Regions:
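Sec-exported extracytoplasmic/periplasmic mature domains
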Residues: 52-63, 90-94, 102, 140-149, ...
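Soluble non-cytosolic domains of exported or imported proteins
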Residues: 41-49, 76-83, 126-134, 187-195
Length: 210
């Protein structure tokens, strides 16, 4: 029996010249969205560190793992935007695509962990909506248990290109706020990154086995 494949997508890491380009927000859409706004200060390396830790834990549990990037910069080809990230996971028939990010806000007091999932949209996400929602709830629950972070909930989004082009269940975890001084310091520590990764992996396992 072939082990399930989990596709980890550490956010950002797109070269600025490419990130400023635009791409359709969904298949057949005339609405265009920037490929990569750059994220919060320090977000890209934190996302990668958590993803690499999650990969090690998943491999130890017998899962197969694919990653959209394993270094500072993404090199997928295919435009290197969020469409390319989704297609990378689609081609591998991933059991789940986990997009790993950290949040940001002009309000430095904002803090906590949230999981974004695709909103239902006919022709775009209708085939992955229910499974993505189930996965999102599983990851949010397990991540909170592992980290003790404040619960910002599971949020449905219709405006994320990486969701709208996905043909496999997909979630996006906002692991904390880089703009909150306390949370930013925590997210940069290996110990906390390991707790986040463990929470994600437990949630992934609960979803895949369910």
């Amino acid at each position: 029996m072939i082990a399930p494949l989990v596709c980890l997508d550490p956010g950002h890491g797109t070269p600025p010249a490419i990130g400023r380009q635009v791409e359709p927000i969904g298949p057949g859409s005339r609405e265009l969205k920037i490929k990569d706004g750059g994220g919060a200060l320090g977000e890209a390396p934190v996302a990668l560190a958590i993803a690499l830790r999650a990969r090690r834990l998943l491999l130890a549990r017998g899962y197969r793992v694919a990653m959209t990037r394993t270094g500072p910069t993404i090199h997928l080809g295919d435009g290197d935007g969020n469409i390319a990230r989704a297609r990378f996971c689609n081609r591998r028939h991933a059991a789940l695509m986990v997009r790993i990010h950290a949040d940001g806000s002009t309000d430095r007091s904002q803090h906590g962990f949230s999981t974004l999932v695709p909103a239902w949209h006919r022709g775009w996400t209708d085939d992955i909506y229910a499974r993505s929602l189930r996965a999102g709830r599983a990851l949010q629950r397990s991540a909170l248990a592992a980290t003790g972070a404040a619960d910002r909930g599971v949020v449905q989004r219709s405006d994320l290109t990486g969701f709208n082009w996905a043909d496999v269940p997909a979630v996006l975890v906002e692991t904390g706020f880089m703009t909150n001084p306390t949370e930013s310091r925590r997210l940069k520590t290996g110990a906390y990154q390991q707790r986040v990764a463990l929470g994600l992996v437990r949630g992934i396992a609960a979803f895949v086995s369910g």
